[in-house]
Amino acid sequence: MSSTECYGAPPHNYYQDWPTTHSYYPSVPSSYSPLNHHPADIWAAHPSNYIMGNGHVSPPATASGLSPPASRSSNSSAELPTGVTASQHNTYKWMHTKRSQRPAAPKKKVIDENGTNRTNFTTHQLTELEKEFHTAKYVNRTRRTEIASNLKLQEAQVKIWFQNRRMKEKKREKEKAFLARNTWESNSPTSSCSGEDVKNFK
């Protein structure tokens, strides 16, 4: 005995209010083949079969369960802002590295013990200045201008160098004189004759 015989089959009028199964599925022509048709094409041909309860048309789902995009070219062009290409749109902010240009380090000035700035002369400049000093310890303004132009220095730098060089030369002369005097005093006889030595000598 089947279940319908035990409990009794409901009358046929009970199912009259139910919609038939054909209303849930789109009407597909007999020549339909899933290999040569896209769900978007079917939806475009029969949009009324996919009307939802709120009145909006719902496109058919693809094999992955997602609605097919309307147009890739239109979506991509709508998402990109004006003046931005596709390659620029794919980059992110964290991919852009900002490199700040470091300013060039300023040249340090050599400060003397008394707080004045001291010029660092090159070897060539010092050699030429020493040659000029041995030629003439005092130079006039015209010669200072020529020396400064040849050595790419300022006239004031040449003037100060000659002043310092003359002071250095005087200091060396004083030291030489002091050493020479001490050497002569140490080598000179310092013994004195006593009174007894003088009597014995007589």
UniProtKB/Swiss-Prot annotation:
GO MF terms held by the record: DNA-binding transcription factor activity; DNA-binding transcription factor activity, RNA polymerase II-specific; sequence-specific DNA binding
UniProt DNA-binding residue ranges: 114-173
Record-level GO BP terms: cell-cell adhesion; embryo development ending in birth or egg hatching
Keyword Lipoprotein applies: no
SUPFAM superfamilies given in the database record: Homeodomain-like
Subcellular location: Nucleus
Biased composition range(s): Low complexity: 63-81
Xref: Pfam families: Homeodomain
CC terms in the record's Gene Ontology section: cytoplasm; nucleus
SMART domains given in the database record: HOX
Segments of skewed composition (Polar residues): 183-194
Top-level taxon in the UniProt lineage: Eukaryota
Keywords per UniProt: Developmental protein, DNA-binding, Homeobox, Nucleus
PROSITE patterns the record matches: HOMEOBOX_1, HOMEOBOX_2
Region annotated Disordered, chain positions: 60-83, 166-202
Keyword Nucleus: yes
InterPro entries in UniProt: HD, HD_metazoa, Homeobox_CS, Homeodomain-like_sf, HXA1/B1/D1
Main location group: nucleus
Matches recorded under PANTHER family: HOMEOBOX PROTEIN ROUGH-RELATED (PTHR45946:SF4)
Name of protein: Homeobox protein ceh-13
Species in which this protein is naturally found: Caenorhabditis elegans
